[in-house]
Regions:
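Residue-level detector of alpha-helical segments with a strong bias toward transmembrane helices
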Residues: 37, 88-90, 144
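C-terminal cap of metal-dependent C-N hydrolases
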Residues: 139-177
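Short, glycine-/Ser/Thr-/acidic-enriched flexible segments
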Residues: 31, 82-84, 149
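Short amphipathic alpha-helical segments with coiled-coil-like heptad repeat character
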Residues: 13, 134-141
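A general secondary-structure junction signal
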Residues: 7, 80-81, 146
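His/Asp/Glu-enriched, well-ordered alpha-helical/loop segment
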Residues: 70-137
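Histidine/acidic residue-rich metal-binding segments in metalloenzymes
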Residues: 1-77
Length: 177
């Protein structure tokens, strides 16, 4: 289940997942942990924050953060990164989806850090999903360092350009190496 995609109250959705059978779990995106629906409209319409399901009210964002950072094995990373060319995002019928692949782990680290739960990020990102599906854990590792950096304004995307989430805005974490 994509937790933020369940209709209605995110707190009730999280309770449903937690109380369901052991093979029921939910993924949660970094952008739904970091932003509420106001992000789409701050300073004018920001099409690169438009996604489906649409970002929720603040109380629902907080419920998603609580679920993700709880340490429960019922919740795990689901980037749902959506690389749409900028010209298809920036018009009247713009495509839904946030491009987060360029900084997925850094965005999740910001969310978990803000919640005081960095110690639970590894389980959410690397352990819970594999365990649910009966898969071995990855043998490789990555390291996150608290180091400010700014994603580029865009990436080449075939003949078009791709504007990532947080383009031109500082991120607090960086994958080392």
């Amino acid at each position: 289940i994509e937790l933020e995609g369940l209709e209605g109250d995110a707190f009730e959705a999280a309770q449903y997942v937690q109380g369901a059978g052991r093979f029921t779990a939910a993924t949660i995106t970094a952008h739904h942990l970091l932003y509420n629906r106001n992000a789409i409209f701050t300073g004018g319409i920001r099409p690169h924050y438009y996604c489906l399901p649409v970002l929720k009210r603040e109380e629902h964002r907080l419920a998603l953060v609580q679920a993700a950072t709880s340490g429960s094995d019922r919740y795990f990373l689901g980037t749902d990164s959506a690389p749409h060319p900028a010209h298809l995002k920036e018009h009247a019928s713009g495509c839904a989806g946030c491009y987060t692949a360029h900084a997925a782990m850094e965005l999740y680290a910001e969310a978990f850090d803000a919640a005081g739960a960095l110690d639970r990020l590894e389980g959410f990102a690397s352990v819970h999903g594999a365990a649910l599906y009966g898969l071995p854990r990855n043998s490789g590792t990555l390291s996150l360092v608290r180091e400010s950096w700014t994603p580029p304004d865009s990436f080449a995307f075939g003949e078009a350009e791709l504007k990532p989430l947080r383009a031109g805005e500082a991120l607090a974490w960086r994958v080392q190496g």
